Amino acid sequence: MMSEYWIISAPGDKTCQQTYDTMNNLTSKQHNLCNNYKFHIPDLKVGTLDQLVGLSDDLGKLDTYVEQITRKVANYLGEVLEDQRDKLHENLMANNSPGPPDDSMPCRHHQRIKHLSLRHQRKHQHTHHQNKPQHYHHHHHHHQLPQDLKGKSAATCSPATPPAPASAPPHLPPACACDVLAPGSLTGGSLTNLSTSHEPEPEFDVCPCDECFACAPPSTSATASTLLADECYSQTASSMLSATRCALSTVAAIATGSGLGNGPSTSAAAAAAASNSSGGGGGGGPASCSTLCSSAYFSTSAPTTSSSVHSSMSRSNSKRLNNNTCSINNNKLSFRSGSHVSQLHLATQQPQHHHSHPHQQPHTNPLQSPVQKSMSEDEGDASNAHEDGETDEDPKSPHSVQSDLSDAFDWWFNKPKRNSKKSSAQQQHETAQLQHQQTTQQHATPLTPQNHNQYQNQHLSKAMTFWHQASTTPRSSYRSFFNSLADQIYSKRSTPSQLNINNGFNLTPTHRSSPVSSCCGSSSQGRSSPDTDPAEPPEFPLSPAELPQYLTRFQWDMAKYPIKQSLRNIADIISKQIGQIDGDLKTKSQAYNNLKGNLQNLEKKKTGSLLTRNLADLVKKEHFILDSEYLTTLLVIVPKVMANDWLTNYEKITDMIVPRSSQLIQEDADYCLFNVTLFKKVAEEFKLHARERKFIVRDFVYNEEELAAGKNEMTKLMTDKKKQFGPLVRWLKVNFSEAFCALIHVKALRVFVESVLRYGLPVNFQAILIEPNKKSVKRLRDVLNQLYGHLDGASAGGAVSSADNVDIPGLGFGQSEYFPYVFYKVNIDMVEQAKV
């Protein structure tokens, strides 16, 4: 496509719609030569034909003037933006430059975490090694990561339970969750290695047991989780996704095979008293520590689960992580919230309490995620749905996966609820079946402690199914999904009268009406193309991408240019408007250019050669003899190749020079700056003889007040330039839009006047906007000449001699550009020059 549009008008046949359909079928649908749009021109006041003849010539001049001012505004806008583009680019590069490479830390953020962890290590190692030396002795040989990030629970038990005897049966759980999840590891395995390869991985398991948490620093779990996320981030997408499914299944299986007890802390509550592996209720063997390791904190650009992160957050008094924050670091999305694996159950209560009060409502936390809310309310909802005859097979149920996903995002972002993407019908059917089975079992079996544990485990599987389904999308898909989600949030919250963030200024668009035009016919009302009906008139073109949209959906601005006025008055309104823009542009551009010129001169003086640059930043007070009645100090510029000559002979240039008073102050590629002290009465003689020897004396007087004033002047100029830059750019954008809109209205006036002059009264013509294909311009001309050649027999054959190439009054172009139909060009390549 081209940046050039054509506006033509043809006399109406029986109806103007028929004229448009005939032309559109022949040029666009059959031969695909162009894209056609209806160009709406209202029913303007015609006046007399004599008035139209004179107005036609004036409109041609006005068209040229308006286009000139529009391009002038666009070009100056490009200059102003180009002036700041290099500095902005340098600032962005300086802010986004990567830090030094490191093997274990991929970015500066994690490098800082590493240093913080090392400081915690030195402090923690001293106290922890004295109190519990057995914790450190096991991992003393590891040096690749901070010691406080390694698993320290291979031989540690919870303080609430005695240590397991050495002759414990093999089916009993080990002392720590790390050993449960990775029995093959000598130091406590890790779930962080999600790939299927057997390459050695750094061992930095974080144990959530009470002993380790009591000794570890507050930020250990959070730091370890960050490092774990970085390790996971280096894996491929396919292995990450498959391993995530396996890991979630493993955690779900561990939780399913154990009951839930009421522990003294979050980790104890999340601990499935691992001694209950036989499926018992609340009290079995000795309950060791939590079987849910913090290695389940996956970073796959999806909502993740981590019991250790929540445990560390609940134990830490620093509150460094916010439970309700969606943090995005290094393009990796990590949800750090209260909705972890250990919190996906109902509110924990003792089994005896449930047995004695089976219908008591669970306690609801003040702030819960949608998953927690749906699970805490599911028991009552299931019974109510059964009594009312409702089923859970509806895919739009609030307990479905789609609703949970949508509510979860609503809860994280605190935005109005929106529909999320639909999952497959198979997932909906399986979810509905699972919920229906839960409802049936709820009413068929009394709520015993064993049934309650099974019911909670089913909800744990359901919640993990939600997280598992939310984690099966690759990283790139989540990035694009959240970008589109942000666009939806902005589009729902923004209105036409609000601030336009992309363009940086607030512009309230003028509402335009769409009058029924006798020249376009009643069937063309509100149509911008033969296939679509716009919901509302186009706004002002606030960006380059909106110029074609404004042009193809053009409608007359009834507020600025009322159609009750005569054509001459409308032309005068446009002329005054553009004249005002031109005058303001001259004033604003002159003020800004003067400010920029003064600032550039000062910058050149700071960065130029020693012959021209300002010496105030180079000299110091100790370089001068001040407040002396007889002595003075001069600054001399010496060519670099003659520096030795100066040091040898400067005392002999004239009399009364202080011996050995010269010293080198500054040098560049070509010159050296020296000072010399002498008597005031021989200063002029010294300058004369120094010039003869090609030594240049700079006129400089050291005055601290003047030097400070010079520095303040440059700071003031920079501040003034920054203050003027923003309003100037906004003014240029607004007035560029105003000038472009005025230009299109002038084109519409010219089409109307020329159509009346050619086709006569009553007004009956159809104006059409054509967007020609770049390779089909010549063929399009031939088709239009065949279609409308009968309107002018002289040019129907397309042969015009050069002798007849003369200007036609009122048209503004030669006969070589004359066609049997009304034709005007609209070129929008001014935007390319503006580089907005």
Curated annotation (Swiss-Prot):
Record's compositionally biased regions (Polar residues): 319-348, 364-374, 496-511
Coiled coil ranges: none
Protein origin, superkingdom: Eukaryota
Effect of deleting the gene: RNAi-mediated knockdown specifically in pHCl-2 expressing enterocytes delays pupariation and reduces food intake.
GO cellular component: a single term: plasma membrane proton-transporting V-type ATPase complex
Region (Disordered): 116-169, 302-403, 415-453, 496-544
GO BP terms: proton transmembrane transport
Composition skew (Pro residues), residue ranges: 160-169
Gene Ontology molecular function: proton-transporting ATPase activity, rotational mechanism
Amino acid composition bias (Basic residues), ranges on this chain: 116-144
One Pfam family hit: V-ATPase_C
Alphabetically ordered keywords of this record: Hydrogen ion transport, Ion transport, Transport
Annotated SUPFAM superfamilies: Vacuolar ATP synthase subunit C
Sequence ranges of Low complexity compositional bias: 302-316, 425-450, 512-529
Tissue spec. comment: In larvae, expressed in the ring gland, CNS, imaginal disks and lymph gland.
Oligomeric form and interacting partners: V-ATPase is a heteromultimeric enzyme made up of two complexes: the ATP-hydrolytic V1 complex and the proton translocation V0 complex. The V1 complex consists of three catalytic AB heterodimers that form a heterohexamer, three peripheral stalks each consisting of EG heterodimers, one central rotor including subunits D and F, and the regulatory subunits C and H. The proton translocation complex V0 consists of the proton transport subunit a, a ring of proteolipid subunits c9c'', rotary subunit d, subunits e and f, and the accessory subunits VhaAC45 and ATP6AP2.
Function as written in the Swiss-Prot or TrEMBL entry: Subunit of the V1 complex of vacuolar(H+)-ATPase (V-ATPase), a multisubunit enzyme composed of a peripheral complex (V1) that hydrolyzes ATP and a membrane integral complex (V0) that translocates protons. V-ATPase is responsible for acidifying and maintaining the pH of intracellular compartments and in some cell types, is targeted to the plasma membrane, where it is responsible for acidifying the extracellular environment. Subunit C is necessary for the assembly of the catalytic sector of the enzyme and is likely to have a specific function in its catalytic activity.
Family, similarity comment: Belongs to the V-ATPase C subunit family.
Protein known as: V-type proton ATPase subunit C
Upper classification of the organism: Eukaryota, Metazoa, Ecdysozoa, Arthropoda, Hexapoda
